[in-house]
Swiss-Prot record:
It is an enzyme of class 6 (ligase). The keyword Zinc applies. Binds 1 zinc ion per subunit. ATP binds at K350. Is required not only for elongation of protein synthesis but also for the initiation of all mRNA translation through initiator tRNA(fMet) aminoacylation. One of its GO terms (molecular function) is metal ion binding. This is Methionine--tRNA ligase. Keywords: Aminoacyl-tRNA synthetase, ATP-binding, Cytoplasm, Ligase, Metal-binding, Nucleotide-binding, Protein biosynthesis, RNA-binding, tRNA-binding, Zinc. Its EC number is 6.1.1.10. GO terms for cellular component: cytosol. Its main location: cytoplasm.
Length: 705
């Protein structure tokens, strides 16, 4: 089995969900269920582990939600913190502590970090231009600005990202910017902000990430390295807002400013651990989990949060640790970021209500059916898809027919024919001859959980159930008992011990069900009550546990009720409606793109300088999955042009192509890259782009007539 002798304990954190809406199944699959599977398994091993999570209660999305509803940000976060904590609890996500970044302890912790780093002279102050809403009398953070995306012409792009094409933006890049507060056109004004110099820590961060190559998932390492390749830039650490952690300075420049949520939120892991420690009656206990090198720190996140946990948070901790010999923080030993789980072939989208929300799901179906379905579809190395049909099939075919059927048959037959007691003793030899290599299974389970391969772990548990079913069916105790009661008794004793083994092996995945199995087996306490640090319950798989004479509970129960077609029909109707609405929006947007623009005169058209150009080099643009950076030859000149064609052409396909270039288009900067023109392309009804090219070989630089 996997062992880590250099770690005495483990601290698991999970990404903080924004408290401005309910969590959906995509969040559960990517972050919270895998963390819970891991934590529950480590507890079974008797290890010292705590699971810390909580709500991210600051940031622009929350203030926007509050303003839309005409309530305070506090009202918004109170509602969704309670809602999400309730959903997590009902789903069996076993946090040791679930905190809030609006707490006094968190504010003090975040301000302490800011002050420490500020006193070291690490922060930089910069004056920048931001949009200011004259009617509202305030600066506008990125999400308070909307406008037209410069890449795909989506007229409803946000100031931080275009949801349609995925391009990350700044408000200044939007065309026709408008304030979300007043719908007025904002003006640019100067404002002073504090910046964190990420580049100062790049060498240390690269060494840190490189030291974990081979341990971390390739997607985590590779994505982080794309940031290194670009070079790490200064990052704003303050914002002009009135909701958040106030900048702890007395200067006039700090008035009306709060800490940027990227800096504030990750420190919640620390402040929440402090609050947990206080509840244990030892206010200093948190230091053992954050500052003792014997503690292993693991961040469970989705892939959209990678850089915040491989670059941002580590650099903050490095800045704190700088110049200290005590009170230094540990950096994460692993960051097992998941890919995305989509919903019926499309990405989850809260803004478009294309989602299945966790609380609503649990109102209709048992938590363990969802936990199992997602574990078996865990997006470890590639995106996966949740579908109602798959959920129904797994519940009915695997949980009900395989696991539930075996448990009920074993207990019912024992209650009926053997007075509800384990009817025989079972030897180690008989246990080992069941056709299950218990030692190998235990090692495979350990490898799966310790390696964050949760689909493999769930599959191993279900394989035990299949083997148990095969054993009981092939042994036919209902026939054998008529001629050999002793043999039938041995079969049932082995079957009941298999029930117990399943209650251990599948516990991390379906904990409520496993405790129900234990109750039917006659155990008075749930498994959680028997867990002790230093004692592994997994070793009970190696030998039969239930001895002859052990009393079962008098009545069994059906563990899983099959899901009828009628139960998921409303969900399928709902998703069909959502897809139809999405397609309608997309069609309307497509139509809006082909509306004729206002007429121009011939003289105005003559001002457009169209030239034949040849692409001589092409490469992707980091963090903009629709853009290619092209170098084009125009006569004797070379130009750099950014084109939104990366979904339709590879860089290799573009090199050598002749294109038509708008050569006198005003230069602009997109995602930090200069674009000196525009190439022409057309879009078909399926949304595919085609480069407009000369029908014959043109001459570079030749004017288009």
């Amino acid at each position: 089995m996997s062992t880590m002798p250099h770690f005495s304990r483990t601290l698991v954190t999970t990404a903080l969900p924004y408290a401005n809406g309910p969590v959906h199944l995509g969040h559960l699959a990517g972050v919270y269920l895998p963390a819970d599977l891991y934590v529950r398994y480590k507890r079974l091993k008797g290890e010292d582990i705590i699971h810390i999570g909580g709500s991210d209660e600051h940031g622009v999305p929350i203030t926007i939600s509050a303003e839309k509803e005409g309530i305070s940000p506090r009202d918004v976060v109170d509602r969704y913190h309670a809602m999400n904590l309730d959903a997590f609890t009902r789903c069996g996500i076993s946090f040791d502590y679930y905190g809030r970044t609006s707490s006094a302890v968190h504010h003090a912790t975040a301000q302490e970090f800011f002050s420490d780093i500020e006193q070291k002279g690490i922060f930089q102050q910069k004056t920048e231009k931001l949009f200011f809403d004259l009617q509202a009398g305030r600066f506008l953070s990125d999400r308070y600005v909307t406008g037209t995306c410069p890449v795909c012409n989506n007229p409803e792009a946000n100031g931080d990202q275009c949801e349609q094409c995925g391009t990350h933006l700044s408000p200044l890049e939007l065309l026709n910017p408008k304030s979300k507060l007043s719908d007025a056109t904002p003006e640019l004004r100067e404002t002073l902000h504090w910046y964190f110099p990420l580049g100062r820590f790049q060498a240390a961060l690269e060494e840190y990430v490189n030291s974990h190559e081979g341990e971390w998932r390739p997607n985590v390492v590779n994505y982080t390295r794309t940031w290194f390749k670009q070079g790490l830039n200064d990052r704003a650490i303050t914002r002009d807002l009135d909701w958040g952690v106030a900048v702890p300075l007395q200067s006039a420049e700090a008035v009306g400013k709060v800490l940027y949520v990227w800096f504030d939120a990750v420190l919640g892991y620390i402040s929440f651990t402090k609050e947990w420690a206080a509840l244990q009656g030892n206010a200093e206990l948190w230091k053992t989990y954050w500052q003792d090198p014997e503690t292993r720190l693991i961040h469970f996140i989705g892939k959209d949060n990678v850089v915040f946990h491989t670059l941002m948070f580590p650099s903050i901790l490095m800045a704190w640790n700088e110049g200290k010999t005590t009170d230094c923080y540990n950096l994460a030993d692993n960051v097992p970021a998941s890919e995305f789980m989509n919903f019926e072939g499309r990405k989850f989208s809260k803004s478009r209500n294309y989602a299945v929300y966790l609380g609503e799901f649990l109102d209709k179906f048992p938590a363990d059916t969802l936990r199992y379905s997602i574990a078996m579809n865990y997006p470890e190395s590639k995106d996966t898809d949740f579908s109602w049909q798959d959920f129904q099939n797994r519940t009915n075919g695997e949980l009900a027919d395989t696991l539930g059927n075996f448990i009920k048959r074993s207990i019912d037959f024992t209650n009926t024919r053997f007075e509800g007691v384990v009817p025989a003793s079972v030897t180690k030899e008989e246990w080992d001859n069941l056709g299950i290599d218990w030692q190998a299974t235990l090692e495979q389970l350990d490898s799966a959980y310790e390696g964050f391969h949760f689909r493999d772990a769930a599959t191993l548990g279900m394989e035990i159930a299949r083997a148990a079913n095969r054993y009981l069916t092939s042994s036919e105790p209902w026939k054998v008992i008529k001629v050999d009661r002793e043999a039938a008794a041995t079969t049932m004793a082995l079957s009941l011990n298999l029930c117990h083994a399943l209650s251990i092996a599948l516990y991390p995945v379906i904990p409520e069900t496993c405790n129900r199995i234990r109750a039917m087996l006659g155990f008075s306490e749930p498994l959680e009550a028997t867990i002790q640090r230093g004692t592994s319950l997994l070793s009970s798989l190696l030998t039969p546990t239930l001895q002859q004479g052990h009393k079962l509970r008098e009545h069994s129960e059906i563990l899983f009720t099959k899901i009828e077609d009628s139960a998921i029909a409303p969900e399928l109707e709902k998703i069909a409606k959502l897809i139809a609405e999405a397609e309608k929006r997309e069609a309307a947007l497509a139509e809006s793109r082909i509306e004729f623009k206002p007429a121009i005169s011939f003289d105005e058209f003559q001002k457009v300088d169209l030239r034949v150009a040849t692409v001589v080099a092409a490469e992707p643009v980091a963090k903009a999955n629709k853009l290619l950076k092209l170098r084009v030859q125009v006569g004797s000149l070379t130009r750099q042009v950014l084109a939104g064609i990366a979904k339709h052409y590879t860089p290799e396909e573009m090199v050598g192509k002749q294109v038509l270039l708008v050569a006198n288009l005003e230069e602009r900067t997109i995602r930090g890259e200069l674009s000196q023109g525009m190439i022409l392309a057309v879009e078909n009804s399926d949304g595919k782009l085609f480069i407009v090219q000369p029908s014959g070989e043109g001459i570079n630089g030749q004017s288009v007539q």
